[in-house]
C-alpha cells in the first residue's frame, strides 16, 4: 500500500475516509446480529443424538451437530462451558424440546478433532481469494499489567491463517497453527479447503517465492497469482513466469502503479476480516490444547460468516 513506501513520515499520512451509502440496511443487519430468536428444526432434533455405531463398548450419546451447536453458542455469547451447558438446558426447557444436553466436560472432550465444514453462500463465479494470517493469544497478561508494573509476562500465541472471498467477504478457508509455522507452508492446506474455480489469489510479500506459485499452479493452473516480489527479487532463468511479469511491470512503471493495475489493494479486505473476527469473537482462544483450538477457530469463522451474510456496508471513498 502507498503509505508503506513513506515509512519516515507515515504518521503524517492521513487515513483514507469512507462514507457508508447503505446505512439503514447495514444498521438493521448489525441489530440482527443480537437477535435472540432460537428454534429447533425437526431435522436438528432428529440429528441431535448420535446413531449407534454397531460396535461393542460405550456408544456416543451426542452427535457432532450437538457439540458444534454448544461450542458455537459459547463463542457467540463469550461464556465458559459450564454457562453454555446451562444455556442449552434453559433453551431446551423453554422450547419444550426433548433432547439430552451435553455437559461441559463432553463439550471440551469432543471439541478436539470435531469435523467442521465451512457454511458458505452458494456462488457461481470463480473465486477471488485473499490470503493472510493473524495472531490469537492463548494465555498471558495484557499490556496494561506490563506498563503499570514493569513486568514481562510470558505470552503464547497461535497463528490463524485465513482465505477470504473478495466479493462476498466470507471466510472460505481457515487453519490454526503454532506461531512458529511459516505462512507459505500453510498455503497448500488453505487451497485444499476450497471447492470450485479460483480466478485469482492475492497475498502479501511474505508469500513471495516459488513455493506459493507452485502450490497455486498445482491446484488451479489458470489462477492469477498477485504477490508483490521482494525488492531484491530477480527474474527466473527459465520460461517467463507470472512472477517475472510482475517484476517487469514494477521495473517499468513502479511498484505503486503495479499495485493499482494488479488489484493488489483488495488484499486490505482480508485485514478487515481479521479485525471483524477479533471484534466479534475476541483476540483470545478459550480452548487450552491445539486440537480444540483448531475446532474453536473453524466454528468461529462460521459464526463470523453468518453475521457477515446478514448485511455488510457499502462504502465510497470521501475525497
Language-model segments: what does each one mean?
Residues 14-16, 26, 36, 44, ...:
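Glycine-rich, flexible loop/turn motifs
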Residues 1-57, 69, 98-99, 109-125, ...:
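Charged, often Cys/His-bearing segments associated with DNA-binding zinc-finger transcription factors
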Residues 95-98, 306:
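Short arginine-rich
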Residues 14, 64, 68, 72-76, ...:
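Basic, amphipathic alpha-helical segments enriched in Lys/Arg and hydrophobic/aromatic residues
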Residues 52-68, 72, 76-82, 86-90, ...:
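Polybasic low-complexity intrinsically disordered regions
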Residues 25-26, 35, 106, 186, ...:
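Exposed alpha-helical structural elements
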Residues 2-4, 11-15, 200, 205-278, ...:
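Helix-centered, glycine/charged polyanion-binding patches within enzymatic domains
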Amino acid at each position: 500500500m502507498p503509505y508503506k513506501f513513506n515509512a519516515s513520515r507515515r504518521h503524517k499520512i492521513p487515513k483514507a475516509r469512507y462514507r457508508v451509502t447503505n446505512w439503514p440496511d447495514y444498521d438493521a443487519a448489525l441489530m440482527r446480529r443480537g437477535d435472540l430468536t432460537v428454534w429447533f428444526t425437526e431435522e436438528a432434533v432428529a440429528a441431535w443424538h448420535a446413531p449407534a455405531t454397531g460396535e461393542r463398548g460405550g456408544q456416543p450419546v451426542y452427535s457432532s451437530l450437538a457439540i458444534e451447536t454448544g461450542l458455537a453458542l459459547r463463542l457467540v455469547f463469550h461464556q465458559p462451558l459450564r454457562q453454555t451447558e446451562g444455556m442449552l438446558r434453559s433453551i431446551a426447557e423453554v422450547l419444550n424440546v426433548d433432547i439430552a444436553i451435553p455437559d461441559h466436560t463432553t463439550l471440551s472432550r469432543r471439541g478436539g478433532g470435531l469435523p467442521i465444514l465451512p457454511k458458505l453462500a452458494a456462488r457461481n463465479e470463480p473465486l477471488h481469494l485473499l490470503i493472510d494470517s493473524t495472531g490469537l493469544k492463548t494465555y498471558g497478561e495484557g499490556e496494561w499489567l506490563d506498563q503499570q508494573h514493569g513486568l514481562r509476562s510470558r505470552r503464547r500465541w497461535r497463528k490463524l491463517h485465513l482465505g477470504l472471498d473478495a466479493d462476498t467477504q466470507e471466510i472460505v478457508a481457515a487453519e490454526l497453527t503454532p506461531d512458529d509455522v511459516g505462512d507459505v507452508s500453510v498455503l497448500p492446506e488453505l487451497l485444499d479447503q476450497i471447492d470450485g474455480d479460483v480466478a485469482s489469489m492475492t497475498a502479501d510479500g511474505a508469500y513471495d517465492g516459488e513455493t506459493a506459485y507452485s502450490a497455486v499452479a498445482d491446484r488451479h493452473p489458470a489462477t492469477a497469482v498477485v504477490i508483490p516480489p521482494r525488492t531484491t527479487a530477480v527474474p527466473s532463468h527459465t520460461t517467463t513466469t507470472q512472477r517475472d511479469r510482475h517484476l517487469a511491470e514494477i521495473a517499468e512503471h513502479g511498484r505503486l502503479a503495479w499495485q493499482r493495475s494488479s488489484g493488489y489493494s483488495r488484499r486490505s479486505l482480508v485485514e478487515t476480516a481479521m479485525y471483524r473476527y477479533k471484534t466479534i469473537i475476541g483476540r483470545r482462544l478459550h480452548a487450552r490444547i491445539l486440537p480444540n483450538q483448531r475446532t474453536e477457530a473453524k466454528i468461529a469463522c462460521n459464526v463470523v460468516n453468518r453475521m457477515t451474510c446478514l448485511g455488510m456496508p457499502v462504502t465510497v471513498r470521501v475525497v
